Amino acid sequence: MKARVKYAIAIGAALWMVPLTQAVAGIDIAAGDWKIDFSGNINAFYVDASCDHGTDNAVAGGLACTGDNSAAVRNGLLPAALVFSASTRQDNLDISATIGFYPGINSSAAAGVNGAGLPAALQTPGIDARQEFLTFGDASWGTVKLGRDIGLFAKDAILDDMTLLGVGTAGPTNIAPSNTSLGRIGLGYIYTDWEPQITYTTPNWMGFTGSFGVFQPLDDGAYTAHNSPQFQAGLAYSFGDPKSDQLTGKVWLDAVTQHAKAPSADVATNTAYGIANDVSGSGVDAGVKVDVAGLEAVVYGYYGKGIGTTGLYVLATDAVGGERKSDGGYIQVTYKLDKLKLGVSYGISDLQLADGELTSDLVRRNDSFVFGAYYGITKSLTLVGEFIDSKSKAHDGDEATEKDVALGAILFF
Protein backbone atom coordinates (compact mmCIF):
# COMPACT_ATOMS: atom_id res chain seq x y z
CA MET A 1 0.00 0.00 0.00
CA LYS A 2 1.39 3.41 -0.94
CA ALA A 3 2.42 5.72 1.88
CA ARG A 4 -0.12 8.37 0.87
CA VAL A 5 -2.96 5.85 1.19
CA LYS A 6 -1.73 4.57 4.57
CA TYR A 7 -1.72 8.05 6.06
CA ALA A 8 -5.10 8.94 4.58
CA ILE A 9 -6.68 5.74 5.92
CA ALA A 10 -5.25 6.37 9.39
CA ILE A 11 -6.59 9.90 9.41
CA GLY A 12 -9.98 8.84 8.10
CA ALA A 13 -10.26 6.15 10.75
CA ALA A 14 -9.69 8.71 13.49
CA LEU A 15 -11.80 11.48 12.11
CA TRP A 16 -14.96 10.01 13.56
CA MET A 17 -14.33 13.04 15.51
CA VAL A 18 -14.97 16.72 15.91
CA PRO A 19 -17.53 17.94 18.50
CA LEU A 20 -20.83 19.01 17.05
CA THR A 21 -21.07 22.65 16.07
CA GLN A 22 -23.78 24.62 17.83
CA ALA A 23 -26.19 24.51 14.90
CA VAL A 24 -28.98 23.43 17.21
CA ALA A 25 -29.27 23.07 20.96
CA GLY A 26 -30.04 19.36 20.99
CA ILE A 27 -32.95 17.51 22.58
CA ASP A 28 -33.23 18.26 26.32
CA ILE A 29 -35.01 16.08 28.87
CA ALA A 30 -35.40 16.80 32.59
CA ALA A 31 -34.89 13.73 34.78
CA GLY A 32 -35.12 14.68 38.44
CA ASP A 33 -32.17 16.95 39.23
CA TRP A 34 -30.46 16.02 35.97
CA LYS A 35 -30.66 17.61 32.54
CA ILE A 36 -30.26 15.01 29.78
CA ASP A 37 -29.24 16.14 26.30
CA PHE A 38 -29.15 14.20 23.02
CA SER A 39 -27.58 15.76 19.94
CA GLY A 40 -26.00 14.62 16.72
CA ASN A 41 -25.82 14.84 12.97
CA ILE A 42 -26.28 12.84 9.78
CA ASN A 43 -24.54 13.83 6.56
CA ALA A 44 -23.90 12.43 3.09
CA PHE A 45 -22.18 13.75 -0.03
CA TYR A 46 -21.63 12.81 -3.63
CA VAL A 47 -17.91 13.36 -4.27
CA ASP A 48 -16.28 13.28 -7.71
CA ALA A 49 -12.47 13.13 -7.43
CA SER A 50 -10.15 13.73 -10.40
CA CYS A 51 -6.75 12.27 -9.53
CA ASP A 52 -3.23 12.76 -10.92
CA HIS A 53 -2.37 10.42 -13.82
CA GLY A 54 1.23 11.57 -14.26
CA THR A 55 4.39 9.50 -13.87
CA ASP A 56 6.31 11.66 -11.38
CA ASN A 57 3.63 11.85 -8.70
CA ALA A 58 5.01 9.70 -5.85
CA VAL A 59 4.77 11.73 -2.63
CA ALA A 60 5.18 9.84 0.66
CA GLY A 61 2.69 11.51 2.97
CA GLY A 62 1.02 13.35 0.10
CA LEU A 63 -2.73 13.83 0.40
CA ALA A 64 -3.66 14.38 -3.26
CA CYS A 65 -4.90 11.20 -4.94
CA THR A 66 -3.15 9.51 -7.87
CA GLY A 67 -4.29 6.94 -10.41
CA ASP A 68 -7.94 6.24 -11.14
CA ASN A 69 -10.56 8.95 -10.79
CA SER A 70 -13.36 8.05 -8.40
CA ALA A 71 -16.98 8.78 -7.59
CA ALA A 72 -18.36 8.11 -4.12
CA VAL A 73 -21.35 8.65 -1.88
CA ARG A 74 -19.77 9.16 1.52
CA ASN A 75 -19.52 11.16 4.71
CA GLY A 76 -17.76 14.51 4.67
CA LEU A 77 -15.24 15.81 7.19
CA LEU A 78 -17.72 14.98 9.96
CA PRO A 79 -18.98 11.46 10.49
CA ALA A 80 -22.51 10.93 11.70
CA ALA A 81 -22.85 11.37 15.45
CA LEU A 82 -25.01 10.65 18.48
CA VAL A 83 -23.86 12.46 21.60
CA PHE A 84 -25.37 11.93 25.05
CA SER A 85 -24.68 14.26 27.97
CA ALA A 86 -26.05 14.56 31.48
CA SER A 87 -25.49 17.51 33.79
CA THR A 88 -26.57 18.68 37.23
CA ARG A 89 -25.43 20.76 40.20
CA GLN A 90 -24.66 18.99 43.46
CA ASP A 91 -23.02 20.33 46.63
CA ASN A 92 -21.95 23.58 44.95
CA LEU A 93 -20.42 21.76 41.99
CA ASP A 94 -21.51 21.65 38.36
CA ILE A 95 -20.95 18.08 37.18
CA SER A 96 -21.52 16.43 33.83
CA ALA A 97 -20.86 13.28 31.83
CA THR A 98 -20.61 12.98 28.04
CA ILE A 99 -20.41 9.99 25.70
CA GLY A 100 -20.31 10.42 21.94
CA PHE A 101 -20.76 7.74 19.27
CA TYR A 102 -19.53 8.50 15.74
CA PRO A 103 -20.61 6.02 13.04
CA GLY A 104 -20.58 6.64 9.31
CA ILE A 105 -22.40 5.55 6.17
CA ASN A 106 -19.54 3.71 4.48
CA SER A 107 -18.59 0.05 4.69
CA SER A 108 -15.64 -0.82 6.91
CA ALA A 109 -13.25 -3.73 7.03
CA ALA A 110 -11.70 -2.62 10.29
CA ALA A 111 -10.61 -5.18 12.87
CA GLY A 112 -12.83 -5.91 15.84
CA VAL A 113 -12.90 -3.64 18.86
CA ASN A 114 -11.20 -6.18 21.13
CA GLY A 115 -7.82 -5.97 19.40
CA ALA A 116 -4.63 -4.79 21.10
CA GLY A 117 -4.36 -1.10 21.96
CA LEU A 118 -2.25 1.32 19.92
CA PRO A 119 -1.51 4.62 21.73
CA ALA A 120 -0.54 6.63 18.63
CA ALA A 121 -1.95 9.59 16.75
CA LEU A 122 -5.25 9.12 14.90
CA GLN A 123 -6.42 6.08 16.87
CA THR A 124 -9.82 5.46 18.46
CA PRO A 125 -11.22 3.45 21.40
CA GLY A 126 -13.56 0.47 21.13
CA ILE A 127 -17.29 0.59 20.32
CA ASP A 128 -16.81 3.70 18.19
CA ALA A 129 -16.94 6.14 21.12
CA ARG A 130 -14.86 9.26 20.47
CA GLN A 131 -15.94 11.18 23.55
CA GLU A 132 -16.06 9.75 27.06
CA PHE A 133 -15.43 12.28 29.77
CA LEU A 134 -16.68 13.80 33.00
CA THR A 135 -16.37 17.35 34.25
CA PHE A 136 -16.75 19.06 37.60
CA GLY A 137 -16.28 22.65 38.67
CA ASP A 138 -17.84 25.99 39.42
CA ALA A 139 -18.00 29.36 37.68
CA SER A 140 -15.91 30.84 40.49
CA TRP A 141 -12.81 28.65 40.02
CA GLY A 142 -13.09 26.76 36.73
CA THR A 143 -13.68 23.25 35.41
CA VAL A 144 -11.75 19.99 35.52
CA LYS A 145 -12.22 17.45 32.72
CA LEU A 146 -11.18 13.78 32.94
CA GLY A 147 -11.56 11.32 30.07
CA ARG A 148 -11.28 11.32 26.29
CA ASP A 149 -12.11 14.45 24.32
CA ILE A 150 -10.78 16.76 21.65
CA GLY A 151 -7.30 18.16 22.29
CA LEU A 152 -6.27 21.78 22.82
CA PHE A 153 -3.59 22.20 20.14
CA ALA A 154 -5.17 23.08 16.75
CA LYS A 155 -8.70 22.62 18.13
CA ASP A 156 -9.95 26.01 16.99
CA ALA A 157 -8.31 25.57 13.59
CA ILE A 158 -10.61 22.68 12.70
CA LEU A 159 -13.70 24.02 14.46
CA ASP A 160 -13.47 27.26 12.45
CA ASP A 161 -12.74 25.47 9.15
CA MET A 162 -15.70 25.99 6.80
CA THR A 163 -15.22 22.48 5.37
CA LEU A 164 -16.29 21.08 8.74
CA LEU A 165 -19.83 21.12 7.34
CA GLY A 166 -18.63 19.80 3.99
CA VAL A 167 -15.90 17.63 2.52
CA GLY A 168 -12.72 19.54 1.65
CA THR A 169 -9.99 17.33 0.19
CA ALA A 170 -11.32 13.81 -0.40
CA GLY A 171 -7.85 12.28 -0.63
CA PRO A 172 -6.61 8.87 -1.78
CA THR A 173 -9.37 6.91 -0.01
CA ASN A 174 -12.26 8.32 -2.06
CA ILE A 175 -12.03 5.30 -4.37
CA ALA A 176 -12.94 3.13 -1.34
CA PRO A 177 -14.33 5.75 1.03
CA SER A 178 -13.51 5.93 4.68
CA ASN A 179 -16.11 7.48 6.96
CA THR A 180 -14.53 10.93 6.86
CA SER A 181 -12.75 13.07 4.32
CA LEU A 182 -9.71 15.24 5.07
CA GLY A 183 -11.29 18.69 4.97
CA ARG A 184 -8.24 20.87 5.56
CA ILE A 185 -6.43 18.41 7.82
CA GLY A 186 -2.82 18.23 6.67
CA LEU A 187 -3.53 21.11 4.28
CA GLY A 188 -3.48 24.02 6.72
CA TYR A 189 -3.38 22.48 10.18
CA ILE A 190 -2.36 19.36 12.07
CA TYR A 191 -5.29 17.28 13.28
CA THR A 192 -6.05 18.09 16.91
CA ASP A 193 -7.08 14.48 17.65
CA TRP A 194 -9.11 13.03 20.51
CA GLU A 195 -6.92 12.06 23.42
CA PRO A 196 -7.25 10.76 26.99
CA GLN A 197 -6.60 13.76 29.21
CA ILE A 198 -6.94 15.55 32.52
CA THR A 199 -7.52 19.22 31.73
CA TYR A 200 -8.27 22.31 33.80
CA THR A 201 -10.06 25.31 32.26
CA THR A 202 -10.17 28.66 34.01
CA PRO A 203 -13.33 30.72 34.51
CA ASN A 204 -14.12 33.25 31.82
CA TRP A 205 -12.61 36.56 32.92
CA MET A 206 -13.68 39.46 30.68
CA GLY A 207 -13.41 37.21 27.62
CA PHE A 208 -10.14 35.50 28.60
CA THR A 209 -9.90 31.75 29.27
CA GLY A 210 -7.05 29.30 29.65
CA SER A 211 -6.81 25.51 29.55
CA PHE A 212 -3.94 23.33 30.70
CA GLY A 213 -3.76 19.55 30.61
CA VAL A 214 -1.78 16.34 30.82
CA PHE A 215 -2.47 13.95 27.95
CA GLN A 216 -1.76 10.37 26.97
CA PRO A 217 1.60 10.54 25.12
CA LEU A 218 1.52 9.42 21.48
CA ASP A 219 3.91 7.04 19.76
CA ASP A 220 6.40 8.74 17.45
CA GLY A 221 7.36 6.16 14.84
CA ALA A 222 9.67 3.64 16.51
CA TYR A 223 9.72 5.68 19.73
CA THR A 224 7.00 3.95 21.73
CA ALA A 225 8.26 4.19 25.33
CA HIS A 226 6.94 7.02 27.49
CA ASN A 227 7.89 7.95 31.04
CA SER A 228 6.20 11.35 31.02
CA PRO A 229 2.86 12.62 29.72
CA GLN A 230 2.15 14.87 26.80
CA PHE A 231 1.34 18.44 27.80
CA GLN A 232 -1.02 20.82 26.03
CA ALA A 233 -2.13 24.34 26.88
CA GLY A 234 -4.34 26.97 25.31
CA LEU A 235 -5.19 30.63 25.86
CA ALA A 236 -8.10 32.42 24.20
CA TYR A 237 -9.81 35.80 24.16
CA SER A 238 -13.33 36.29 22.78
CA PHE A 239 -15.02 39.62 22.15
CA GLY A 240 -18.48 40.80 21.14
CA ASP A 241 -21.92 39.27 21.55
CA PRO A 242 -23.16 37.55 18.36
CA LYS A 243 -26.76 38.30 19.36
CA SER A 244 -26.29 42.06 19.62
CA ASP A 245 -22.91 43.24 18.27
CA GLN A 246 -21.87 43.83 14.66
CA LEU A 247 -18.22 43.03 15.48
CA THR A 248 -17.36 39.72 17.15
CA GLY A 249 -14.40 37.39 17.18
CA LYS A 250 -11.66 35.61 19.08
CA VAL A 251 -7.89 35.21 19.31
CA TRP A 252 -6.16 32.05 20.46
CA LEU A 253 -2.74 30.56 21.18
CA ASP A 254 -1.98 26.88 21.88
CA ALA A 255 1.05 24.70 22.58
CA VAL A 256 1.89 20.98 22.69
CA THR A 257 5.00 19.10 23.80
CA GLN A 258 6.04 15.55 24.60
CA HIS A 259 9.10 13.32 24.99
CA ALA A 260 9.31 9.75 23.66
CA LYS A 261 11.95 7.05 23.99
CA ALA A 262 13.00 3.95 22.12
CA PRO A 263 11.99 0.66 23.78
CA SER A 264 14.76 -0.69 26.03
CA ALA A 265 15.20 -3.67 23.68
CA ASP A 266 16.30 -1.29 20.90
CA VAL A 267 18.71 0.89 22.88
CA ALA A 268 21.88 -1.15 22.28
CA THR A 269 21.26 -1.47 18.54
CA ASN A 270 20.39 2.21 18.20
CA THR A 271 23.55 3.22 20.02
CA ALA A 272 25.70 1.00 17.81
CA TYR A 273 24.25 2.50 14.61
CA GLY A 274 24.11 6.11 15.76
CA ILE A 275 20.34 6.24 16.07
CA ALA A 276 18.82 8.49 18.72
CA ASN A 277 17.27 6.74 21.71
CA ASP A 278 14.88 9.56 22.56
CA VAL A 279 13.09 12.33 20.71
CA SER A 280 11.12 15.42 21.67
CA GLY A 281 8.44 17.27 19.78
CA SER A 282 6.94 20.68 20.53
CA GLY A 283 4.70 23.06 18.62
CA VAL A 284 2.72 26.27 18.90
CA ASP A 285 -0.20 27.68 16.95
CA ALA A 286 -2.17 30.91 16.87
CA GLY A 287 -5.26 32.20 15.16
CA VAL A 288 -7.64 35.13 14.76
CA LYS A 289 -11.31 35.03 13.77
CA VAL A 290 -13.28 38.22 13.12
CA ASP A 291 -16.92 38.62 12.03
CA VAL A 292 -18.26 41.99 10.87
CA ALA A 293 -21.93 42.01 9.88
CA GLY A 294 -21.79 38.57 8.24
CA LEU A 295 -18.31 38.96 6.70
CA GLU A 296 -16.05 36.53 8.53
CA ALA A 297 -12.28 36.05 8.24
CA VAL A 298 -10.03 33.43 9.84
CA VAL A 299 -6.22 33.58 9.83
CA TYR A 300 -4.36 30.65 11.39
CA GLY A 301 -0.77 29.43 11.57
CA TYR A 302 1.40 26.85 13.35
CA TYR A 303 5.05 25.90 13.79
CA GLY A 304 6.67 22.87 15.35
CA LYS A 305 9.80 20.77 15.59
CA GLY A 306 9.36 17.03 15.95
CA ILE A 307 5.53 17.13 15.82
CA GLY A 308 5.17 15.99 12.20
CA THR A 309 2.45 16.83 9.71
CA THR A 310 -1.22 15.95 9.10
CA GLY A 311 -1.48 14.13 12.48
CA LEU A 312 0.40 14.73 15.72
CA TYR A 313 3.77 12.94 15.64
CA VAL A 314 3.18 11.52 12.14
CA LEU A 315 6.38 11.74 10.01
CA ALA A 316 7.91 13.71 12.88
CA THR A 317 11.40 12.13 12.73
CA ASP A 318 13.71 10.54 10.17
CA ALA A 319 15.25 7.06 10.26
CA VAL A 320 17.91 8.04 12.82
CA GLY A 321 15.66 10.11 15.08
CA GLY A 322 16.34 13.51 13.55
CA GLU A 323 13.48 15.87 14.32
CA ARG A 324 11.77 17.46 11.32
CA LYS A 325 10.41 21.01 11.42
CA SER A 326 6.89 21.69 10.19
CA ASP A 327 4.75 24.76 9.68
CA GLY A 328 1.63 25.89 7.90
CA GLY A 329 -1.67 27.67 8.17
CA TYR A 330 -4.73 28.86 6.31
CA ILE A 331 -6.69 31.97 5.37
CA GLN A 332 -10.45 31.81 5.05
CA VAL A 333 -13.11 34.38 4.16
CA THR A 334 -16.86 33.74 4.21
CA TYR A 335 -19.85 36.00 3.67
CA LYS A 336 -23.41 35.25 4.72
CA LEU A 337 -26.33 36.44 2.61
CA ASP A 338 -29.51 35.56 4.47
CA LYS A 339 -29.50 31.73 4.41
CA LEU A 340 -26.57 31.38 1.99
CA LYS A 341 -22.94 31.42 3.12
CA LEU A 342 -20.22 31.68 0.46
CA GLY A 343 -16.61 30.94 1.33
CA VAL A 344 -13.09 30.63 -0.03
CA SER A 345 -9.97 29.40 1.74
CA TYR A 346 -6.35 28.51 1.03
CA GLY A 347 -4.05 26.51 3.28
CA ILE A 348 -0.63 24.85 3.32
CA SER A 349 1.20 22.34 5.49
CA ASP A 350 4.99 22.11 5.04
CA LEU A 351 7.41 19.48 6.35
CA GLN A 352 11.17 20.04 6.24
CA LEU A 353 13.90 17.41 6.12
CA ALA A 354 15.77 16.75 9.36
CA ASP A 355 19.38 17.93 9.62
CA GLY A 356 21.49 15.65 7.43
CA GLU A 357 18.49 13.80 5.97
CA LEU A 358 18.84 12.85 2.30
CA THR A 359 16.40 14.15 -0.30
CA SER A 360 13.59 11.68 -1.03
CA ASP A 361 9.95 11.52 -2.06
CA LEU A 362 8.94 12.60 1.45
CA VAL A 363 6.17 15.19 1.33
CA ARG A 364 7.40 18.79 1.35
CA ARG A 365 4.03 20.52 1.03
CA ASN A 366 0.32 19.73 0.92
CA ASP A 367 -1.89 22.66 -0.03
CA SER A 368 -5.43 23.32 -1.24
CA PHE A 369 -7.91 25.94 -2.40
CA VAL A 370 -11.54 25.45 -1.35
CA PHE A 371 -14.58 27.26 -2.73
CA GLY A 372 -17.80 26.51 -0.86
CA ALA A 373 -21.50 27.37 -0.75
CA TYR A 374 -23.58 26.44 2.30
CA TYR A 375 -27.35 27.03 2.20
CA GLY A 376 -29.41 26.69 5.38
CA ILE A 377 -32.80 25.34 4.37
CA THR A 378 -33.72 25.35 8.07
CA LYS A 379 -31.70 25.98 11.24
CA SER A 380 -30.96 22.23 11.31
CA LEU A 381 -30.55 21.31 7.62
CA THR A 382 -27.81 22.67 5.35
CA LEU A 383 -27.16 21.98 1.67
CA VAL A 384 -23.47 22.03 0.72
CA GLY A 385 -21.55 22.46 -2.52
CA GLU A 386 -17.73 22.62 -2.71
CA PHE A 387 -14.94 22.69 -5.28
CA ILE A 388 -11.50 21.70 -3.99
CA ASP A 389 -8.11 21.95 -5.74
CA SER A 390 -5.35 20.12 -3.83
CA LYS A 391 -1.65 19.58 -4.53
CA SER A 392 1.10 17.50 -2.91
CA LYS A 393 4.82 18.14 -3.51
CA ALA A 394 7.79 15.96 -2.53
CA HIS A 395 11.33 17.03 -1.63
CA ASP A 396 12.66 15.31 -4.76
CA GLY A 397 10.39 17.34 -7.05
CA ASP A 398 7.56 14.86 -7.61
CA GLU A 399 4.06 16.26 -7.25
CA ALA A 400 0.42 15.26 -7.56
CA THR A 401 -2.80 17.24 -8.01
CA GLU A 402 -6.42 16.43 -7.17
CA LYS A 403 -9.63 18.23 -8.03
CA ASP A 404 -12.86 17.40 -6.17
CA VAL A 405 -16.49 18.40 -6.53
CA ALA A 406 -18.74 17.67 -3.53
CA LEU A 407 -22.53 18.04 -3.25
CA GLY A 408 -24.64 16.96 -0.30
CA ALA A 409 -26.36 17.86 2.93
CA ILE A 410 -25.85 17.78 6.68
CA LEU A 411 -28.59 17.66 9.34
CA PHE A 412 -28.02 18.55 13.00
CA PHE A 413 -30.44 17.68 15.78
Question: Which residues does each predicted region cover?
Answer:
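Outer-envelope beta-barrel architecture signal
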Residues: 32-40, 89-95, 140-144, 206-208, ...
